[in-house]
């Protein structure tokens, strides 16, 4: 299967081959500004893990895109913020570079800065840039890269299975290989750069999938992300938490989280509330909403009704949208 054309080919030739600007992206001021541009979102659950785990903290980052398009300070700040959360495990769901091998040493330096164990899968940009080279850079930085495989890691005296599905966008995902030999008696979490692969993983009793690729639209003004990523690109899962349909009698519902990512591609900008750079922290083993400081940002997980706070926020959003529409209509009269 041939790989789809890279969107980076729309850029001027060899943009990613140019050296980075001379500005000191590691200065205290640059890092402070970068930290302010990254949102840390926190979630508790899914509920299924409460019977299998005694409290683990997982950090999820995606689409780091080390290279010229994303400032180095942004990536340093992302690692710094992640370490401050003191996760038990860091999971990275692909697109580490941006159509170039020029910055692989910098990628190695970056992932080496994580304090916790790190596991990863590759994305489409990694294949367009040279999957073997990207994989080796990650491994030199201490990252365990899963390619259609799963592994078991001991954390806080308990075992967690991690499934890593290779990139589906470039045709490298082999789900059957990834789940072969999974133990049903152990809690399992999966990584896939493309969120739509979660449908097949749920069917194999993998309850929770982390993914990326969409950048949450990257530019989310006036609903452009829903048009570009959803309708035009054909993605059912654009950003945030989505639940599965049940697969047969007695099957447990699953969930997939689509991260907004850290870096950018094609354009060096991210605009709109939903397009902000993001780190997601998951507290496994807790009931959703059980941790007070997580309650506001906790979406309704599959099989659970929305909280009163969520209902109020949704109602307020509907009213705000209607008022904006009415205001716009009044100006055109």
What are the roles of these predicted feature ranges?
Residues 1-57, 68, 313-333:
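Acidic, histidine-bearing metal-coordination/catalytic regions of metal-dependent phosphoesterases
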Residues 27-34, 61-74, 97-102, 126-130, ...:
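Acidic/histidine-rich helix-loop elements
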Residues 38, 46-59, 143-144, 150-163, ...:
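Beta-strand-turn-beta hairpins that frame and shape the catalytic cleft
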Residues 59-62, 89-95, 117-124, 146-149, ...:
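Active-site neighborhood of phospho(di)ester-bond hydrolases with catalytic His/Asp-centered motifs
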Residues 67-154:
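Core catalytic region of metal-dependent phosphoesterases/phosphodiesterases
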Residues 96-98, 124-128, 151-153, 167-170, ...:
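Solvent-exposed loop/turn segments at secondary-structure junctions
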Residues 136-143, 149, 155-200, 204, ...:
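Binuclear metal-dependent hydrolase catalytic cores centered on His/Asp/Glu-rich metal-binding motifs
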Residues 140, 195-280, 289:
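Conserved beta-sheet core of the metallophosphoesterase superfamily
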